[in-house]
A protein has these predicted regions:
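Short glycine/serine/threonine-rich phosphate/pyrophosphate-binding segments
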Residues: 78-81, 138-143, 164-168, 191-195
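Buried hydrophobic positions in well-ordered alpha/beta secondary-structure cores of metabolic enzymes
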Residues: 74, 157-159, 198
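Long, charge-dense
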Residues: 87-125
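Charged, compositionally biased N-terminal leader segments and the immediate start
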Residues: 1-29
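N-terminal glycine-rich anion-binding loops that anchor highly charged ligand groups
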Residues: 26-40
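A short, well-structured juxtamembrane/interface segment
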Residues: 49-64
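C-terminal functional extensions of proteins
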Residues: 165-208
Length: 208
């Protein structure tokens, strides 16, 4: 009976299989590790086609992380999935304000969504931030509105909300307006796990 594979061996073999299954497909070298990390997380090769990157988005995201920026997510799941060991070493931390009592109260009293208030709260942070949105298209639309009003200047937008209502519109608006560097999963696919995977793909490149 052969010895069980160690976690790192499993991951290495998984990436070898991904490379094999991509075949002759040529990926942009700057974006390749992000795309493969998302495929590894989801087992979905559609991400080789639907992940869209603004010019040098990966490079800019890595530079922001090296500079100690924070990461803002729209779910606790995405927050939990991000490698905090590397992020903390770089001087950053992860925030998710969606379930904060003050956010809920402000949303109720103002008649707006918690997503908008949470993005507004994040925009008020003193440090540069990467916004990793994997669940709520309203958070992405709110962030775009705040950028239009010059109240938010993201270091990078990871726009990968999943679903059917306002999802594609929110993503396309980020791409069309291009007010900040972005990594967007076009179409309906995405999720908190995808948002976390993209953050980790950037962090792991710094680790190396």
């Amino acid at each position: 009976m052969s010895e069980p594979m160690k976690p790192m061996e499993i991951e290495q073999r998984s990436f070898e299989i991904i490379t094999e299954l991509l075949g002759d497909r040529v990926l942009d070298p700057e974006n390749e590790l992000v795309i493969k990390r998302v495929i590894h997380t989801t087992a979905d090769f559609d991400y080789a086609d639907n992940l869209t990157f603004s010019d040098h988005a990966v490079r800019k995201g890595i530079a922001a992380l090296k500079g100690g920026c924070d990461i803002v997510t729209d779910t606790q799941m995405a927050k939990a999935g991000i490698n905090k060991t590397i992020l903390t070493r770089l001087g950053g931390e992860v925030h998710c304000f969606m379930s904060d009592p003050d956010v809920a109260q402000e949303a109720k009293s103002s008649g707006v969504t918690r997503a908008f208030v949470s993005m507004e709260k994040a925009a008020a942070l003193e440090k540069p931030c990467i916004f990793a949105i994997g669940n709520a298209p309203t958070a992405l639309l709110s962030l775009e509105q705040l950028m239009e009003e010059r109240k938010a200047t993201p270091a990078l937008i990871i726009g990968v909300p999943v679903g059917f209502v306002n999802v594609e519109i929110s993503k396309e608006r980020i791409i069309e307006k291009a007010r900040a560097p972005y990594i967007v999963a076009r179409g309906r696919k995405g999720g908190s796990n995808v948002a976390a995977a993209i953050c980790n793909a950037l962090l792991y490149q710094i680790k190396r």
